[in-house]
């Protein structure tokens, strides 16, 4: 189970090369901001970025090519949404408009409403999980901070503790994604692993390296 906000798993380079011949995912915050502000044109988006980031977006606008813009659209919308949800496909006309309609589905939904929806769902399915011995595991938001104005509800220690306590059942557990959690400088991944070990039902062992400016890159393959 992913939180609803994980609908926006946003990366700008899905094939960032490493010296050993492998590749991984790279998040460039300024290019993501450019997509949000100049391509998507989301209302109020400028409030989500610092003055320094807005200035960098303005500079990028002077040099970015149409091919690079198309690549951002393809990476952030077509490839990512096609993989995660299957609701956008290669060859779809005007994927930006399709994506805007998907975002509009969350209009008026705040953090508290999304939390309550999660609590309601988990409470409803726990009796069935108990009956059949099924463990549910919630995947952290990826990345673990707000994007595109959407509420994020599984980003840190407090969030994880909240959903585990909201439906305090051993079948309600965590997917411990080291990559997602370590992308947030606010998270101590080792301590989180220790604290929530008993309620961790599935593990994604891949780390990320956080860099200045909000960028991060997933490590090479284990």
Please provide the spans of the model-predicted regions:
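Extended, charge-rich helix/loop segments that form flexible
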Residues: 15-114
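Active-site glycine- and acidic-residue-rich loops that bind
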Residues: 65, 106-121, 151-155, 173, ...
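Gly/Pro-rich active-site loop or hairpin
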Residues: 115, 147-161, 181-222
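Acidic (Asp/Glu)-rich catalytic clusters
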Residues: 126-133, 163-171, 190-200
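Hydrophobic faces of well-ordered beta-strands that scaffold small-molecule active sites
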Residues: 136-138, 172-176, 201-205
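An acidic- and aromatic-residue-enriched active-site/binding cleft used to recognize and process polar
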Residues: 141-143, 177-179, 208
């Amino acid at each position: 189970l992913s939180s609803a906000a994980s609908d926006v798993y946003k990366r700008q380079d899905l094939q960032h090369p490493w010296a050993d011949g492998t590749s991984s995912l790279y998040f460039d915050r300024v290019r993501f901001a450019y997509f949000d502000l100049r391509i998507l044109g989301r209302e109020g988006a400028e409030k989500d970025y610092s003055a320094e980031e807005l200035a960098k977006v303005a500079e990028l606008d002077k040099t970015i090519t149409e091919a690079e813009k198309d690549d951002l659209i393809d990476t952030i919308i077509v490839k990512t949404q096609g993989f995660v949800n299957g609701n956008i496909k290669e060859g779809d006309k005007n994927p930006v408009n399709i994506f805007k309609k998907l975002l509009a589905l969350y209009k008026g939904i705040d953090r508290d409403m999304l939390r309550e929806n999660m609590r309601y769902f988990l409470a409803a399915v726990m009796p069935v999980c108990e009956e059949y011995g099924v463990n549910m595991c919630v995947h952290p938001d990826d990345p673990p901070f707000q994007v595109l104005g959407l509420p994020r509800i599984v980003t840190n220690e407090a969030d994880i503790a909240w959903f585990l306590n909201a439906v305090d059942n051993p079948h309600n557990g965590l997917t411990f994604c080291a990559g997602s959690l370590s992308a947030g400088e606010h998270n101590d991944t080792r301590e989180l692993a220790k604290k929530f070990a008993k309620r961790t039902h599935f593990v994604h062992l891949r780390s990320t390296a956080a860099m200045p400016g909000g960028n991060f890159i997933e490590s090479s393959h284990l």
